[in-house]
């Protein structure tokens, strides 16, 4: 249909194009109704490459040039190499021969069953050293069309005029010092201000079908990432949420940012055609600002499945663990008996080789420094003990090591400031029939990194949850038997013991199975999720007192806002009822509740660290009353405004009621004659004051019975 036909059809239907906002039109995922989008324009060239039919063919160059007598021997060597990397089709290897000299030309074509096998063979064999003089150069057959179309004369790129972008930190300058949160329900993704003064969220941005799976904030809150079948996209701003960059990675399933937001890692897995084979995994690392792909990694899910809490198709996520701090200098991958640490300057291995650590099963970076902790379980049937070690990067020097005996399992927990490392150690009893738990506590910032051993009062108690106080020196442990475990608080330094761990208190028989510290410390929520149906206890650890107890029935998620002033509890669509979220104050006062059908996700927008020095923050804390007067006055104004709004609302309701009563009386009067005719002329609409009420009393004798009582 041409433009003229469209205009004619619109005129016939009475549609005024000037009144139509095309930016507000959103189509369901995968449906374009024949309208080409800007995404299709970007990926059109790439899509056409997959339709050539030669995607399963590779070209291997730098082969030896041999005569006819050695042809079969060379062909056998090449087949032996590439049969390990994929299935070569029958007659799928062709080695051209010079018709005059009868010598091979030094290259060959190999056709595999699938494009995936061809791509894998290219990745694995490019640079393969057959001997000193012959190092393979491998390309996809389809690449030659692209290379042949390169113009011989270089044309300088056209300079684009500079267009200043939006201030991506503008949302931090909100006059009311509010925080933003994003929610997903049904097809909609919505961003709100958390406006507790108004007892309701203030809408910022809403878009249906904004993402095809989930959304995720970057660690410092600058970007919001969405996932699509073509790849990932990041958006930014305080309220506009304009698209800043796209990252091409077909059917992306997971993303992860580096701590300083410089890099974005995307993940895609593909199920194999043969159920016995492992899934194929492709991971790409992009520069967030430029969109340039810095490195990609490909392989089977088995190669990416060691360590970590789990992911998609058997691969652990995140596959790459980023070193602490905002420099984004190093990231590591755990493989079988190997730890590969890469530097982002060249995106290659440090010292061009991986660290060999036999039987290593878990690694964890310090949140602030380039220190890597690792856990190696027992080997040789217990003859070789388990160990936890701290390794400095990039020097790979071992800073500290602790051997552990009779170990069943270990979990490592870094404190947010990188000052402490807690290692929960599950050990076998002497009979090997059960386990008990304890902690190895590393003081990272102290000389020689001293280690303390902590055992619970009842070492047979099962440890249900552990959590460090953010930016603090305390930690909490839930331990004991369900449904009423105990909660204990410990401190790494007290006024009496600055260098030893001390127990502060134990709370007996609590309905809790999860711990949620405030981001600023001091306050913690003892939460009973899942089987406990959303029991909440807001606890002040400084005073060791409960501030409030509450319940959010069937709550599945709890998340503090980045300032520690408010906390959100949510019931997601895993439950069919009561979907939505509730906002609470830090001390357990419910502020407002929002119900949303098919509610999937809630995430607060993170804030970057404060630019104020510790001394300046301490100074502000001392003079807080001076600053608080302004906000107290604003709160009072808002309270008066809300009261006035409530009065206006009640007044409007009263006027509406009185209007309805007058309408009813008017209608009643109009129908008076009709009612009188229906009652044969009897006038029944008589006011109450025309009647006289009399009170009449009467007695009715029902029965009489006589009894003779004898005196004793």
Curated annotation (Swiss-Prot):
- The highest taxon in the source lineage is Eukaryota
Asked if Acetylation is a keyword of the record, the answer is yes
* A biological-process GO annotation: formation of cytoplasmic translation initiation complex
Which residue ranges does the record assign to the RRM domain?
56-143
GO cellular component term, pick one: eukaryotic 43S preinitiation complex
Q: Where in the cell is it found?
A: Cytoplasm
User: What keywords tag this UniProt record?
Assistant: Acetylation, Cytoplasm, Initiation factor, Protein biosynthesis, RNA-binding
Q: Name one GO molecular function term.
A: RNA binding
Question: Which residues does this entry mark as bearing N-acetylmethionine?
Answer: 1
General function of this protein:
RNA-binding component of the eukaryotic translation initiation factor 3 (eIF-3) complex, which is involved in protein synthesis of a specialized repertoire of mRNAs and, together with other initiation factors, stimulates binding of mRNA and methionyl-tRNAi to the 40S ribosome. The eIF-3 complex specifically targets and initiates translation of a subset of mRNAs involved in cell proliferation.
Quaternary structure per UniProt? Component of the eukaryotic translation initiation factor 3 (eIF-3) complex, which is composed of at least 13 different subunits. Binds to the translation initiation factor TIF3H1.
Q: Which family does it belong to?
A: Belongs to the eIF-3 subunit B family.
The name of this protein is: Eukaryotic translation initiation factor 3 subunit B
Its source organism is Arabidopsis thaliana
Gene (name only):
TIF3B1
